[in-house]
């Protein structure tokens, strides 16, 4: 029986692409590449480079500059300076103050609360940065502070089993009681499944599900609008 539902944040509760797009246009107005593809590359680079922060090899500000510079380098854009990378980060943060929950998320939270199901948040990223997003999204109205876990606080990151185990301990539950909702098949879904959790994969990027045989036990939906109906099947 599901006793708690834990959510990823970026691209699951809200779309960070719009703040990214606005900041990119402000700092690199001549950039002509596909913004969606650039954003997804930015996320992949960010996930990889953040490992340096977890290992204590660089600080958050350095990481934020490096991820943007490497993203634009891989897009064959002109060399980005440290100053431009810092300007992008400032603009990106400012735009993030406007973020809102996606359609279907609030309704899902309301449903879970009405059925006395615990709600948790498990997110990768720098502690201060992720907590600002939590504040902008007003997630504390739905999620207790003790049920929120940001990877930098722990020294682990999804898909590490250790961070899922820490989340389970925070909730006072076992893996059999837990359901994880996320958009990233590697960090969210594989991490959850390998930790013994049930999972819902919001595959809004329309990735080829057949390419991921190990995810056959995950619930897969194509959009956030399908989330509540799927939750209702699991928690009637």
Language model segments and positions:
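Asp-based, Mg2+/Mn2+-dependent phosphohydrolase catalytic module
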Residues: 1-5, 33, 106, 110, ...
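N-terminal helical cap/lid subdomain that shapes the substrate entry/recognition surface
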Residues: 2-103, 114
């Amino acid at each position: 029986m599901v006793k708690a539902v834990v959510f990823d944040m970026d691209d699951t509760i809200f779309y960070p692409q719009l703040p990214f797009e606005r900041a990119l246009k402000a700092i690199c107005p001549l950039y002509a590449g596909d913004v969606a593809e650039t954003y997804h590359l930015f996320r992949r680079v960010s996930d990889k480079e953040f490992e340096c922060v977890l290992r204590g090899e660089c600080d958050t500000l350095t990481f934020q500059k490096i991820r943007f510079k490497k993203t634009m380098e891989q897009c064959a854009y002109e060399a980005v300076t440290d100053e431009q990378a810092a300007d992008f980060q400032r603009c990106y943060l400012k735009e993030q103050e406007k973020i809102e929950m996606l359609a279907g998320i609030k309704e899902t939270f309301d449903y879970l609360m009405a059925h006395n199901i615990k709600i948790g948040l498990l997110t990768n990223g720098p502690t201060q940065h992720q907590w600002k997003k939590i504040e902008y999204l007003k997630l504390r109205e739905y999620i207790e502070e003790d049920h929120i876990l940001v990877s930098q606080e722990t020294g682990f990151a999804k898909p590490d089993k250790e961070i899922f185990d820490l989340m389970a301990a925070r909730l006072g539950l076992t893996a059999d009681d837990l359901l994880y909702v996320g958009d990233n098949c590697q960090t969210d879904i594989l991490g959850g499944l390998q930790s013994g959790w049930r999972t819902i994969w919001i595959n809004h990027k329309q990735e080829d599900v057949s390419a991921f045989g190990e995810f056959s036990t995950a619930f897969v939906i194509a959009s956030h609008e399908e989330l509540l109906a799927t939750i209702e099947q699991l928690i009637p």
